[in-house]
Amino acid sequence: MKYLSIIILSFGLLLSCKKPKDRVEKREDENSKLTVKEHFAVATNVSSWKNYKEKRVDDSTKFVSGNFNNYYITGFLDSKGKKKDWWNITDKNNDKSVKLLYEIIGNNEEISQYIYYNSKEIDKTKSKFYEKKKIDSDTYRMIFHTPIGFTKTNQQGDFGYYLNCDNEKKGIIDVKCDMEKGYYYTDIKNIEKCSKINIIGAFFELYQDGDGNFVENTIYVKESLK
């Protein structure tokens, strides 16, 4: 991807993306003025919860839970009070819920993935997440889902990553993903020779919305393939 640059850090990665001036972050819905991060900011602010509880997991992490309006929320905070890992927001009045994956990128909290559920079934029209699928002994397919309930033109998806094969870093690879209805995918090949292999990187979707603005979606990836 023209604007993609990946800088590898000890934890995993820090991603920077040179943006056109009119590019905007993904909105919660097409008519919303809030980004996804802003949309969930109030509900995941523990200072606004009732029946707040916390439990120390280790020296750097604590598990928190509480109630906000009609929602029961659980998640994790790091030693600086920043949100990390998977958070769950459950509507106490129905069978709907959402899972959020927070990543610390630089000093910022970013929502890398969010998955909406209806009756425990994933609502792929609203969700942003990735999954892996084993094709054969030498190939894994990385599948990236982004919300499809939006006007999208000039879509493209790019995946920048490196492989860690038996603790040896295998360069940085940028690929343009193939696209099916509602998702993107790319195949990771030639992994059979590795006894242990991890993939670390980021997927970027770029498109124009109904107003002609450039909109981006980012999914950070840190996954064991075997």
Language-model regions, residue ranges each:
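Glycine/tyrosine- and acidic-biased, solvent-exposed loop/turn segments at the edges of beta-strands
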Residues: S16-K226
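Positively charged n-region of N-terminal signal peptides that target proteins for export
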Residues: M1-L4, K19
